[in-house]
């Protein structure tokens, strides 16, 4: 699954882009406005075709207002709750993680690497940093659950809070990347303490 794309790359092209835009904004734009909001990623013709197809599927409603036609999500459509969940792959990843970790032993789970920076592809691995107690040893199990739930291989780095702080002080590149680009999925990013002296 491509965690960087709406719907994880399952619904692609103009149809996926239009559907993601309408689900995320809750707005009621015209077809031309949808096209402009997509920043030219798709032609006006392909946006109009996508809107037509989504209206035919019943997921999107069209309403005539004066000389214009506006589009909105049909909130009564049976697929909309699932589509809302799918439009946010990082949210789905968070759900997978929360279902398989003991939050009493884990302070934070942080997404980092290409998936966090927006440079991932469908076959990119998912890099996670787990900061927790020294007796937490579920990295292999967590990686398996993430792979099963998302379809991507998963690499898990594990730190205690003290180990993470020490790695920050040493200036370890991977920890710098985590602090710079990391997306907290559980808990929060550790705050870097200013050096004294």
What are these model-predicted stretches?
Residues 1-107, 117-123, 132-197:
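Catalytic core of pol beta-like nucleotidyltransferases
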Residues 127-128:
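Conserved, compact domain cores that house catalytic/ligand-binding motifs in diverse enzymes
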């Amino acid at each position: 699954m491509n965690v960087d794309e709406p719907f994880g790359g399952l619904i692609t092209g103009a149809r996926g882009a239009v559907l993601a835009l309408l689900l995320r904004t809750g707005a009621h734009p015209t077809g031309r406005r949808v096209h402009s909001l997509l920043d030219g990623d798709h032609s006006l013709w392909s946006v109009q075709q996508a809107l037509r197809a989504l209206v035919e599927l019943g997921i999107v409603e069209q309403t005539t207002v004066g000389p214009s036609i506006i589009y909105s999500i049909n909130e009564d459509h049976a697929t909309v709750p699932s589509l809302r969940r799918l439009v946010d792959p990082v949210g789905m990843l968070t759900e997978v993680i929360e279902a398989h970790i003991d939050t009493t032993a884990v302070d934070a789970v942080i997404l980092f690497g290409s998936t966090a920076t927006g440079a991932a592809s469908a076959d990119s691995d998912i890099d996670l940093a787990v900061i927790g107690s020294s007796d937490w040893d579920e990295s292999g199990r967590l990686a398996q659950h993430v792979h099963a739930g998302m379809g991507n291989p998963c690499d898990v780095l594990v730190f205690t809070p003290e180990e993470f702080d020490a790695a920050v002080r040493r200036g370890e590149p991977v920890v710098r990347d985590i602090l710079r680009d990391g997306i907290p999925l559980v808990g929060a990013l550790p705050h870097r303490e200013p050096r004294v002296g």
